[in-house]
């Protein structure tokens, strides 16, 4: 399957249907949020955590909001899709890693923008495929992310995570202890203009995080 980004290059993102955890839907709102919050800024390197086939990252790259892109995902098949996207679109400014942890990234990888549509739920009904995309038990993946991402942030770097209040019912407060322990701080919380619907399973919001 192909998902075509909306920028000038119209990057053809290669993927299987099971890999889409919302990246082709509410994930594409990232473009507007970044353009509105950081007007006229072009980031040196964007990192998409829990990338899947990198619908979000390739969209940001195609809109020229970053000069280069790094992605990682626990599933090797997702990273193979990223590599195929790089090949068919003749891209030379993308790095991709099959790892389930930020600690698994090479030390040299540094970013000034970090984005993600990570697993949003501690638990939720659904088949095995949905479970592996949607569930982060005990927020273990989030805890590991916050613990290790700081060493990869460039000065002035921004973390902008896309979360779902239907899963993190206390919103950013569910993650505040992990963020503070890592020497980071929340600088903004933004409700999705298009995909925040109270009492619905899509209650998307964004957490902006920076180094203290």
Identify the meaning behind each predicted range.
Residues 19-27, 49, 138-142:
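Short, conserved glycine- and acidic-residue-centered signature motifs
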Residues 118-144:
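Mobile active-site "lid"/loop adjacent to the S-adenosyl-L-methionine
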Residues 76, 80-83, 88, 104, ...:
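Class I S-adenosyl-L-methionine-dependent methyltransferase catalytic core
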Residues 1-38:
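Class I SAM-dependent transferase core
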Residues 19-20, 78, 167-169:
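Alpha-helix N-cap/loop-to-helix initiation residues
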Residues 141-194, 199-201:
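Conserved Class I SAM-dependent methyltransferase catalytic core
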Residues 200-208:
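Short hydrophobic/aromatic beta-strand or adjacent loop that forms the aromatic wall/cage
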Residues 26-107, 113-116, 122:
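Conserved SAM/SAH cofactor-binding pocket of Class I
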